[in-house]
């Protein structure tokens, strides 16, 4: 029920986006005045840019991961390389648990063909995840946010320690 209500709410926001923006600006202008309104709009614009760039970085990282997974699986001559590589890339958009979902689905599919191929896939994906998580992700997302990779890793670790998965997602663009 809450999912349905969320979809309805989102749909209504999208339909009346321009009206909602105009009404929100009028309300903020009346409450804050000219000077504070200009500062508030600057902060909102900066946050919008940061979150937009973060999402673009996440999508870029997912495409890179999916492509590397597909290429590696083809080189290892594993079955379903294109399908599983695409799936792993899409699952990379889900913070923390996404890679595990991709690995589990791929392992189950390959296990039905050969347990050895499933193990080979898991080892390859584990190594790829290490490279992706420690090198590719900080560089890709960091470059979109104009933030050094070290700060991206620090934001993920601190955010995760303070707020769990949601902190990992929110702290990177907030750090920028």
Model-inferred region functions:
Residues 2-109, 119-120:
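Alpha-helical transmembrane segments and their immediate interhelical loop/hinge regions
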Residues 93-100, 114-115, 130-132, 158-169:
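Hydrophobic transmembrane alpha-helical segments of multi-pass transport and channel proteins
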Residues 107-121, 125, 175-176:
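Membrane-interface alpha-helices
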Residues 16, 20, 43, 47, ...:
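Helical mechanochemical/support elements of P-loop NTPase systems and associated helical scaffolds
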Residues 27-30, 54, 90-93, 108-111, ...:
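Amphipathic alpha-helical segments that mediate coupling or scaffolding at interfaces
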Residues 60-61, 116, 129, 147:
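Alpha-helical transmembrane segments of multi-pass membrane transport proteins
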Residues 72-91, 123, 139-176:
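Canonical bilayer-spanning transmembrane alpha-helix
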């Amino acid at each position: 029920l809450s999912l349905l209500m969320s979809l309805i709410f989102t749909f209504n926001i999208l339909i009346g986006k321009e009206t909602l923006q105009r009404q929100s600006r009028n309300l903020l202008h009346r409450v804050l005045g000219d000077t504070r309104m200009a500062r508030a709009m600057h902060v909102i614009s900066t946050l919008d840019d940061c979150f937009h760039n973060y999402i673009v970085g996440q999508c870029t990282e997912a495409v890179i991961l999916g492509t590397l997974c597909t290429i590696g699986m083809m080189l290892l001559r594993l079955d379903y390389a294109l399908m599983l590589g695409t799936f792993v890339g899409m699952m990379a958009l889900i913070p923390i648990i996404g890679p595990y979902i991709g690995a589990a689905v791929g392992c189950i599919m390959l296990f039905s063909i050969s347990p050895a191929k499933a193990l080979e896939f898991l080892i390859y994906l584990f190594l790829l995840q290490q490279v992706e998580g420690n090198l590719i992700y900080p560089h890709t997302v960091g470059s979109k946010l104009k933030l050094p990779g070290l700060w991206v890793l620090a934001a993920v670790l601190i955010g995760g320690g303070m707020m769990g998965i949601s902190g990992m997602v929110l702290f990177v663009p907030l750090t920028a």
